[in-house]
Amino acid sequence: RIQSNIDLPQALEVFVGNVHRYCSKFLFEENIIPAGSSIIDDDDAISILSGYLEEEEQGVSSNPTLRRSYFSCVQLAAFIFQLKSNHPKELRLHPDCITADDVTALRYLCQQLHIELSASTMVDIFDHSKRYADALDNPLFDYGMAKLLKSFFKRVDIANYYASYKDENQLYDFEDLLMLTYNAYTSPSANEYRHYSWVQIDEVQDLNALQLAIVDAITTKEQRSVVYLGDEQQAIFSFMGAKLSTLSLLKERCKGHIYHLHTNHRAPSYLVKV
């Protein structure tokens, strides 16, 4: 559409799309993910996990409770990847996939094994969950804690299977696109990738912290122009990990260059009043 309206060679260099689309385009063009790879959605994730758990796929899809339990494992897989990639804590997509009960039980486990609960310990637990689960056979182990840990280790097993299945079949979900792009743009070879001196982001309140970090990473450090467009009222609904704190951060960053639009020019007044 841009090329059909702007007859300039520079039009070919303009990218228009959401953050996920940019990440997908970037990862394929830079051969960070193989050309034969496929992008999967939530339904595909349910299909993968229902096969592993030997549950009827349609039954899972139509059951909100089962869907939530499945996606808690998908989210845990992303959490594990981010932990292994040393992503800053504030950029984690699903920090709440590790519940307060999980933390309490893991602290108890570490106390029994005389080790400290840290990020590196968590990575080791994720990589060797079956070995750690053997500790639950100790008859002196607290029953309540053992029950919590069995539930946790089951989720870890499912999350690890999901990650392994994707790797073996060259599959990537939408969160993989974000995490891999962030890794690439924060790696030692980041200067080899294209950066943009002019960036415009619409619906910025819908961006989560990782998406915003990607926008920052692809923007040139010098002589840049960045425009953020958003609706503060919509931000209160916290969509897809986005929070009001995103706009608060941008307010501080853009202090002195913030403009409020109060007139709606996209709809007639009688429609707005309905």
What are these regions (language model features)?
Residues 57, 78-157, 161, 165:
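Conserved ATP-driven helicase/translocase motor core recognized via long
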Residues 17-24, 47, 70-81, 100-104, ...:
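Non-catalytic, well-ordered alpha-helical scaffold segments
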Residues 15, 44-45, 140-249, 263-267, ...:
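Conserved helicase NTPase motor core
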Residues 2-101, 248:
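Conserved P-loop NTPase-based nucleic-acid remodeling module centered on helicase motor cores
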Residues 254-255, 272:
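Helix-loop-helix "sensor" segment of P-loop NTPases
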Residues 21, 224, 252-253:
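ATPase/helicase motor core of nucleic-acid motors
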Residues 2-5, 29-33, 213-216, 241-245, ...:
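Short, glycine/charged-enriched secondary-structure capping and boundary segments
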Residues 35-38, 256-263:
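Inter-lobe coupling/hinge region of RecA-like P-loop helicase motors
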